[in-house]
C-alpha cells in the first residue's frame, strides 16, 4: 500500500525547517538525480572537501575553547621540519587513556583533519604515534567497532548474516588514521597506516577486549583480532593504495560504499531536527546510547525526514568511500567464516620492524625529492585547528561554484 504524502502548511515550523534543509543542500550544490536521490556537485577531492567544510567549521567552533587552552601546552609536541631526520625516524605507539594530556593531544591532532573525524563507537583503541628520535608526534590512530552493515566487506569475507552476527567481534574499524605535518609531507601517512598491523596492536586488543561482551548482543565472546577495515573519505586514496612492505600487503582495496550517510547534515541542522522530534515526543530525539548501535544519528535524521515528509533518499549523498581491509590474521577470512577456530598471526611484525621498512620504502626517498617539509614550522599548526577561514585550508569555492550552476532542489 502506497504511503500517503505528508502535507505541511507553508507557514508552520515544519515548513521553515524543510526550507532550511533544502536551502542548505542547495548551498552545498546538490541537485536531484533522475531517480529522485541527491546528486553531488562533483566527485573531485576539492569538491568533497568543500562539502565537508561547514561540518568541519561547526566542529572547530565547538572546540575553540579547548583549542585555545590546549594549543599553548601541547604545541611543542609537533615538529618543526628542521627537527625531522627521515633516516632516523623511530616510531612508537602509545595507547591513549581518557582524561590524560595524551588524550588532549590526540583530540587536538584530530581537529587538523580536513574531513571531520568520528569519535568512534563501543570498543576503542586510540594511539599516538611518536618519533622517538626527536620526541615529536608523527600521527594518530583510532580503532573502534565496525559498522554492522557494510556490503563490500561482507561479500569479500563471504559472510552470511548469521556469520556476521557471531564473528563481527573479531573485526575493528580504523576510523582515524593519518600523519600530522611535517611527517605527512614525507609519506608518514603510509607509515601510520602500516603500524595498524603490528604485534603491539594485537597484544593491546587481546589484553583489553579478548574476553568481552558484544555491545548489541550483550553475549560474552572470545574475540581474536582478525581484520581491520578503513575507508578513504576523499575517494581513491594515494596514501592507502599500493600499501605493501616486502610481500605483505597492509591495506587491500575491496570496493566502494554506496554513498549513504549524514555528513551533509551539519551539527547545527541536526540539533534542529532533534528539537523537532523532541516536540513530537519521538523516541529518537535523545536516544544515543552505545547499546542502541552506531547508526543512531542516521536513524534520527531519517525519522525526522519521515515526519517532515522528506524522502529518505536525501540521506544518499552519492559520495562513495573506497573501502580497504587489513587482514591482521593470515587466516582472517577463514576465521570470520567459522572455518578456522584460532587466528594465525604468521609474519606479524613489531612497530620497530614496520617502521624500519616504511622508512626505507617511502619516507627517506620522498624526503630526498621533496624537501619542502624542512620549511614547516610548528606555529603553522594553529591555522589548521582554527575555525577562522584560512587561505590555506578553506576551499576557494563553495561546492555550488565548483561546477556549473544547476537546477535548485524543490519539492520533497
Where are these regions (language model features)?
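Extended, composition-driven regions rather than compact fold-specific motifs
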Residues: 1-412
